[in-house]
Amino acid sequence: MWPQPYLPPHPMMLEESRQNKLAAAKKKLKEYQQRKSPGIPAGAKTKKKKTDSSPETTTSGGGHSPGDSQYQELAVALESSSVTINQLNENIESLKQQKKQVEHQLEEAKKTNNEIHKAQMEQLETINILTLEKADLKTTLYHTKRAARHFEEESKDLAGRLQYSLQHIQELERALCAVSTQQQEEDRSSSCREAVLQRRLQQTIKERALLNAHVTQVTESLKQVQLERDEYAKHIKGERARWQERMWKMSVEARTLKEEKKRDIHRIQELERSLSELKNQMAEPPSLAPPAVTSVVEQLQDEAKHLRQEVEGLEGKLQSQVENNQALSLLSKEQKQRLQEQEEMLREQEAQRVREQERLCEQNERLREQQKTLQEQGERLRKQEQRLRKQEERLRKEEERLQKQEKRLWDQEERLWKKEERLQKQEERLALSQNHKLDKQLAEPQCSFEDLNNEKKSALQLEQQVKELQEKLDEEHLEAASQRNQQLETQLSLVALPGEGDGGQHLDSEEEEAPRPTPNIPEDLESREATSSFMDLPKEKADGTEQVERRELGFVQPSGVTDGMRESFTVYESQGAVPNTRHQEMEDVIRLAQKEEEMKVKLLELQELVLPLVGNHEGHGKFLIAAQNPADEPTPGAPAPQELGAAGEQDVFYEVSLDNNVEPAPGVAREGSPHNNPTVQQIVQLSPVMQDT
């Protein structure tokens, strides 16, 4: 490698080096600004690098280069940047102070807002209190209006219920007729079904015989096919052994020919070597060769030709043997393919045989199942007949039970009426004594506190007596109502669910497809008179529930009167003790309101206890209006209410119990109603007067 000559730097290269140096200086300035510490000016290092890299660019005589001026500019820029940094720090501190002032102002504003919010909350609380008082006043007005509307709605509801009950009775009569017709049709169809079942049995027996014959034929054909298959397999095995022997012989011959060929090739190679040696000897300068040598050479040439001919013959034999081997391999392959095809055919035949056997088994199973189903259907028909007979017996027994229950209910009603008369007399006596006492108190408002306390004690004793009587009557009525409910629920369950009972066993899916038998209703119930007597039982339950509700009203109103008297006594005591104190008046008003709420709660609890046992009733006034107008006929234009779905046994019974074909005694109903009782009306009129005073 020759040394390269030194060339001067290009001016473009100089400019690039300067730009690189400027970029490095800027980086160093940034680092200086970040660290804020004085450092060595970047010009010295760059100057050294510049002098090392390009010594020719240095100026002579100690003159300043343009790089020095740039370094000075950079130093000036550093000083100016430090000044700007100081100014920025001062600005930041001033901004922080302003921020603190603003935060202080915000805190003061929040405090003022909180105070305003508290004042607003206090005002809202006062407004809420006023609204609550207003709501209480509205509720009192609403309850009074609601009571008036409630009585009107109940009267309309009763008229609709009566009409609906009549329609329901007609529907039940139609259902009874339909049940009787269905039973007759089923009796007719049962005989037809037995004939059809016998025909099916005969057909199935014939089909089974045909299938058995077909099975025997198929089994014989399968045996023949198996014998043919065995013979053919033996023949194939013999041919395969023959072909294997021939292949073994051909392979042995091929091996011998290959060995002979190798030997001949070895001899030919030796002869060729000897010929090459002789040719080399012949190529040498001619010498006086004896004639014996020439003769030897000729002999060798003849032998070589003879050997070549033999080799060619052996090659032809090898090719022919190879062709024969290929033909044999093709034949063996074809035979293998044929054998595989035959094996596949045999497998398919076996699969078909298995399928036919499975089909035959399935057909036999189907026939057996059909026989079982036919037998089961016959048994079911017999069981259905037995069930119908049992249901007839049950209905007769239930009729006897219902007649006995009617007698018991009449006896219980007579006892209840007697107790009601006694209670009404006691109520009248209590009301008269209370009226006399109230008249005396109103005439002499400045009586002594001892008289007021005695009256208060007497009122409490009366209340206790009334409560005890009420509890006794409630227990008796609840027991009677529970007994009636149980008896009538059992009756309705038997009528609504005729399929259930002692004979109601689990049926299969095939039985569900056949029409279910309807209960055989006795001939006594098909007549109009029998149905009316059958439907009078739920009506008697409705009468009993009306009596219970009347007694509840009779006890609730005197208890409300005693509560009003007690409240009036407390007001008089507070006025006598401190006549001109407004605070005690407010306390008295609060006590009165609390007592009213307690009485309302007690009334609601009594309603919740009594109503579920009596029936799903909506109010106490319904049965009062029904008792006053028991024989009102429904208007023809009144719309019938929609039929209810499968609600339950209690709902069905409630719909039936509203039918009142038997009119109760009008005098008894009016005596039990509080609207026609003069003593109760006087007490009700006096109670608001005492509250106003």
UniProtKB/Swiss-Prot annotation:
Pfam families: GOLGA2L5
Transcription is among the record's keywords: no
Biased composition (Basic and acidic residues): 537-547
Record flagged with keyword Coiled coil: yes
GO cellular component, as recorded: cis-Golgi network; Golgi cis cisterna; Golgi cisterna membrane
Superkingdom of this protein's organism: Eukaryota
Alphabetized UniProt keyword annotations: Coiled coil
Sections of the chain in a coiled coil: 14-611
Chain spans, region Disordered: 20-70, 497-547, 662-693
Bias (Polar residues) ranges: 674-693
Gene Ontology biological-process entries: Golgi organization
Family annotation (InterPro entries): GOLGA_cons_dom (IPR043976), Golgin_A (IPR024858)
Assigned protein family: Belongs to the GOLGA6 family.
Protein name: Golgin subfamily A member 6D
Name of the coding gene: GOLGA6D
